[in-house]
C-alpha cells in the first residue's frame, strides 16, 4: 500500500491558493486605478489639441522641502490643475549604482495626496523620483553610475516599483515620471525601454520621462550630433508624453522685452565671442512631436527673479549679482506663454518651483509672474 503524505499535499494546496489570491488581489487593485485619458482633439472646429481628461496641464513643481499648507495655497494662487510631486531618492555619491527611496519624503508625498483628496481639490498628480545625491550637494546631471546594469535593476525594483506599490496605484496617481535629467544614463535606450515595459506591467496610468534642455549651434557640429541622438532616442517611443526641463538659454541681456524673448525662442541670441547660436528652440522642441507623435510637456519651466534670467535659466545667479528683477522673470514666462499656449501639440507646463517661498527660493514666481501664470489656460483648457 502506497503511503501518501496528506500534510504535504495540503500545504502545497494552501500555497497554490495563496498565490491565486495574491494574483487576483493585484489584478483587482490594478483594475481599480482610474487611468487618465490622453486625447488629441483637433477638428475643423477645435484646435485645442492634446489634453489630459479634456484639459491642458497647468502644474506646479514642488521643491523637495515644500510646505504642505503653502502648496494648498499655491494651487489657488496660480490656478493650477496638477501638482508635480517629488519623492527624494537617497544616493550616496555621483558614481553609485545603488539607491533607496527616502521614507520620510515618501510619507510626506502620501500625506499631501491624501489632503488633496480629502479637500476634493480635483488636482491631478505627476509623481517622480528626485535623486538626492550626497545629501543634496550634487545635481542629477552629475550622476554617472559605475555599473549601468546594476543602476537600471535598482532603479526599477528599488525606486519605481516602490513608488508604484506605495503611492501610484493605491492613490490613483495620474502620471509617473520615470526619470528626470539623467544625462549620463539617457543614451541607454534599450534599458529605458525595458524599464518602461516593467513599469506598465504594474501601473496603468500615464508614463513620461523628463529630458534636460539642450543647446545647438551651426558652428558647433558636436551639438547638432548630440541633439539628433537625443531626438532619435527610442525611449520616447514608449512614453505617453514627452517631458522637457525647459531651461533654454535665450539672450545675453540682463533685461529684455517680451517681444525680444519671443524672438529668441525661435532664434537664440546667445553669443560666444561674437558667435551667435541662432538656435530655433521652438522648432527643435516640436521635432520631438513630429518624430514620435507624443505631446510635449514642459516638466519644469522656471526663471530666477534676477537680471540675466534668460541667459542661463538653470543658474539662478550666473554673474553673482544681487539685482532682483521680478519683471524680467515675468517677461520670460509671458514669452513662453505667447509662443506655446496655442500649439495643439503642446500639452502644458509645470512652474518651477512652488510650495515654499523662503528667501533661498529664487525661482518662486513674483507677483508679476503670478499674473502671467494665472492667465495661461485661464479658460480651463
Task: Label the predicted regions.
Residues 41-51, 309-381:
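Aromatic-rich peripheral "rim/lid" segments of glycoside hydrolase catalytic domains that contact
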Residues 57-59, 82-84, 122-126, 174-177, ...:
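Structural preference for beta-strand elements that scaffold enzyme active sites
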Residues 19-28:
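Bacterial N-terminal signal peptides
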Amino acid at each position: 500500500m502506497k503511503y501518501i503524505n496528506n500534510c504535504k499535499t495540503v500545504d502545497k494546496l494552501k500555497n497554490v491558493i495563496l498565490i491565486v489570491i495574491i494574483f487576483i488581489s493585484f489584478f483587482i487593485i490594478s483594475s481599480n486605478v482610474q487611468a487618465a485619458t490622453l486625447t488629441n482633439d483637433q477638428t475643423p472646429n477645435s484646435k485645442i489639441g492634446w489634453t489630459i481628461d479634456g484639459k491642458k496641464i497647468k502644474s506646479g513643481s514642488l521643491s523637495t522641502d515644500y510646505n504642505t499648507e503653502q502648496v494648498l495655497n499655491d494651487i489657488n494662487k496660480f490656478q493650477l490643475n496638477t501638482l508635480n510631486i517629488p519623492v527624494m531618492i537617497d544616493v550616496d555619491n555621483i558614481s553609485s549604482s545603488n539607491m533607496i527611496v527616502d521614507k520620510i519624503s515618501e510619507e510626506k508625498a502620501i500625506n499631501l495626496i491624501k489632503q488633496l483628496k480629502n479637500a476634493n481639490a480635483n488636482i491631478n498628480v505627476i509623481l517622480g523620483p528626485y535623486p538626492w545625491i550626497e545629501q543634496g550637494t550634487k545635481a542629477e546631471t552629475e550622476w554617472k553610475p559605475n555599473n549601468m546594469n546594476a543602476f537600471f535593476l535598482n532603479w526599477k525594483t528599488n525606486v519605481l516599483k516602490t513608488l508604484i506599490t506605495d503611492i501610484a496605484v493605491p492613490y490613483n496617481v495620474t502620471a509617473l515620471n520615470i526619470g528626470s535629467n539623467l544625462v549620463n544614463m539617457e543614451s541607454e535606450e534599450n534599458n529605458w525601454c525595458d524599464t518602461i515595459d516593467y513599469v506598465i506591467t504594474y501601473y496603468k496610468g500615464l508614463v513620461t520621462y523628463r529630458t534636460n534642455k539642450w543647446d545647438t549651434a551651426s558652428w558647433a557640429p558636436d551639438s547638432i550630433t548630440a541633439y539628433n541622438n537625443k531626438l532619435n532616442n527610442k525611449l520616447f517611443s514608449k512614453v505617453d508624453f514627452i517631458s522637457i526641463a525647459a531651461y533654454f538659454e535665450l539672450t545675453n541681456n540682463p533685461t529684455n522685452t517680451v517681444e525680444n524673448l519671443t524672438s529668441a525662442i525661435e532664434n537664440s541670441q546667445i553669443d560666444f565671442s561674437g558667435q551667435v547660436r541662432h538656435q530655433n528652440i521652438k522648432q527643435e522642441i516640436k521635432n520631438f512631436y513630429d518624430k514620435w507623435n507624443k505631446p510635449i510637456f514642459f516638466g519644469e519651466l522656471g526663471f530666477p527673479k534676477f537680471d540675466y534670467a534668460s541667459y542661463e535659466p538653470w543658474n539662478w545667479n550666473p554673474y553673482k549679482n544681487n539685482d532682483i528683477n521680478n519683471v524680467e522673470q515675468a517677461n520670460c514666462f509671458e514669452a513662453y506663454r505667447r509662443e506655446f499656449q496655442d500649439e495643439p501639440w503642446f500639452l502644458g507646463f509645470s512652474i518651477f518651483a512652488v510650495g515654499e517661498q523662503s528667501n533661498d527660493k529664487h525661482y518662486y514666481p513674483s507677483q508679476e509672474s503670478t499674473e502671467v501664470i494665472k492667465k495661461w489656460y485661464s479658460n480651463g483648457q
